[in-house]
């Protein structure tokens, strides 16, 4: 379909022919000077109202075809001198050169006049009759349109002249509501990423750092010491400061003749040593079946050790035998304190010590009298607890022992073994 329009603007008569199938506008303009000019350009697409980017097609107009005019006349060849017959006048090429320069000046003046009139006509129409006829501008508009068409849905924009306006800046109620970029998701992802990164650094700095590994490790078999020497220095090689006084040792104290012998080699009279001899005395009486052994639990229940009949009482007696025998082995061989904790190891590959019994520890003193009323022989001396171990007080050991029920949830344990 072809639309024809005739308009008179400022003395300029324009005849416009537009084709809807391709949007090309063909204008034939008659200037005030009487000269006819033909102009071809492509009408701009209407501004989209649904929020979609405009799509442009390539359409370039050669600069020579934008404002066609009379072709410049070819420059005449230099005229050859003509000699008149009979010695007439001679015509030089100076006159021809002057004539060519005059013609060229007139042509340039007409071209400048046509260009000025075209600019005035486009300015008076407000730029609404068509897009700029420059080939460079048309190519730039086509490139801008393709870029807008390839953008994501949330970045779709409207092209307004030479400026691309994103949908975030458009406040048009009729425009399509486009999805916003997931800013909250991106921020949360970055936050979680950095938290995991910091946790990984902390794990490397502390969890896998050998300087922060626990000092306790299975020491293998017995770490023997020469007799008369001190035990290992507390806190070195994993030695606890209060040996056998922690809740997880569960080593009962031994009461003989109203004197209490504590697992840290102290007694209620303020003396040092004697716990190994007291434990061996209890082992000898138990193996002889003496009825004068009484056990006191943390629940203030008292029962006979050799005549225990209930399920709980038998379990308490077995635990009492195990821990007393283990303590005697550690003290007799001058082992490090932590050796006590590897009696129940995972296997022989770690060099663990088999859990001893009363019969095993009685082999240390085969001449021990098995009389139930025999007094305690203190000839067996414990190791020297002077120096770093001197700060271990009976009161502290008595308070710490079996008062914390958090490891593990023991129901009842033997706190004292009394020889009556």
Curated annotation (Swiss-Prot):
It is a single-pass type II membrane protein. Glycans are attached at residues 258, 264, 300, 304, 371, 384. It is found in: Virion membrane. The keyword Cell wall biogenesis/degradation does not apply. Keywords: Glycoprotein, Late protein, Membrane, Signal-anchor, Transmembrane, Transmembrane helix, Viral envelope protein, Virion. Residues 1-184 are intravirion. The chain crosses the membrane at residues 185-205. GO terms for cellular component: membrane; viral envelope; virion membrane. Residues 1-21, 64-129 are annotated as: Disordered. Rearranges cellular actin to increase intercellular contacts and thereby promote virus cell-to-cell spreading. Induce the outgrowth of long, branched plasma membrane fronds to create intercellular network for virion traffic. The fronds are actin based and RhoA-dependent. Plasma membrane remodeling is mediated by the cytoplasmic tail. Belongs to the herpesviridae BDLF2 family. Interacts with BMRF2. This is Protein BDLF2. It comes from Epstein-Barr virus (strain GD1) (HHV-4).
């Amino acid at each position: 379909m072809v639309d024809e329009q005739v308009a008179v603007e400022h003395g300029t008569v324009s005849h416009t022919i537009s084709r809807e199938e391709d949007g090309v506008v063909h204008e034939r303009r008659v200037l005030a000077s009487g000269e006819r000019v033909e102009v071809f350009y492509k009408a701009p697409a209407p501004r989209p109202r649904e929020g979609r980017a405009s799509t442009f097609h390539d359409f370039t107009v050669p600069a020579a075809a934008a404002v066609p005019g009379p072709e410049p006349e070819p420059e005449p060849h230099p005229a050859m001198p003509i000699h008149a017959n009979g010695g007439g006048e001679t015509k030089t090429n100076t006159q021809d050169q002057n004539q060519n320069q005059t013609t060229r000046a007139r042509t340039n003046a007409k071209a400048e006049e046509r260009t000025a009139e075209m600019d005035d006509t486009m300015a008076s129409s407000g730029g609404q009759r068509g897009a700029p006829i420059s080939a460079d501008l048309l190519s730039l508009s086509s490139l801008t349109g393709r870029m807008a068409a390839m953008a994501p849905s949330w970045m779709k924009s409207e092209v307004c002249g030479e400026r691309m306006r994103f949908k975030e800046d458009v406040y048009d109620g009729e425009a399509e509501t486009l999805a916003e970029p997931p800013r909250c998701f991106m921020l949360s992802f970055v936050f979680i990423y950095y938290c995991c990164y910091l946790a990984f650094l902390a794990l490397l700095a502390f969890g896998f750092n050998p300087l922060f590994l626990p000092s306790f490790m299975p020491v293998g078999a017995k770490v023997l010491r020469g007799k008369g020497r001190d035990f290992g220095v507390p806190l070195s090689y994993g030695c606890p400061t209060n040996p056998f006084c922690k809740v997880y040792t569960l080593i009962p104290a031994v009461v003989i003749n109203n004197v209490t012998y504590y697992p840290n080699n102290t007694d209620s009279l303020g003396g040092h040593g004697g716990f190994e001899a007291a434990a061996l005395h209890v082992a000898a009486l138990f193996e002889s079946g003496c009825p004068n052994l009484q056990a006191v639990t943390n629940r203030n229940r008292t029962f006979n050790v050799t005549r225990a009949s209930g399920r709980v009482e038998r379990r308490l007696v077995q635990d009492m035998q195990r821990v007393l025998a283990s303590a005697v082995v550690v003290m007799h061989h001058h082992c490090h304190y932590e050796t006590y904790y590897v009696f129940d190891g995972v296997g022989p590959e770690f060099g663990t010590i088999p859990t001893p019994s009363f019969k095993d520890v009685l082999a240390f003193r085969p001449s021990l009298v098995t009389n139930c009323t025999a007094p305690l022989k203190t000839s067996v001396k414990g190791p020297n607890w002077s120096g770093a171990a001197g700060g271990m007080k009976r009161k502290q050991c008595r308070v710490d022992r079996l008062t914390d029920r958090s490891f593990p949830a023991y129901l009842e344990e033997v706190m004292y073994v009394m020889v009556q």
